[in-house]
Swiss-Prot record:
Encoding gene, per UniProt annotation: hfq
Organism: Stutzerimonas stutzeri (strain A1501)
Protein name: RNA-binding protein Hfq
CC per GO annotation: cytosol
Function as written in the Swiss-Prot or TrEMBL entry: RNA chaperone that binds small regulatory RNA (sRNAs) and mRNAs to facilitate mRNA translational regulation in response to envelope stress, environmental stress and changes in metabolite concentrations. Also binds with high specificity to tRNAs.
Superkingdom assignment: Bacteria
Family in the record: Belongs to the Hfq family.
Amino acid sequence: MSKGHSLQDPYLNTLRKERVPVSIYLVNGIKLQGQIESFDQFVILLKNTVSQMVYKHAISTVVPGRPVRLPTAGDAEQSESGND
């Protein structure tokens, strides 16, 4: 995993799992709102009244509608050991 994804993926995944409403600002200034349905290396699926595929290279900023807590390395170890 590249260094850039070590923060991006857990952040987007937390927003997705907790169904946090987000505002996504594009580089051209357009504001999109909805919930993150899914994402991969290149795109984010944003769901509102319709689903939109937003290319990450077009995104300037992702703003959550409420504060989110990112999982730490210790949290990941605890959840893995809890599955034994």
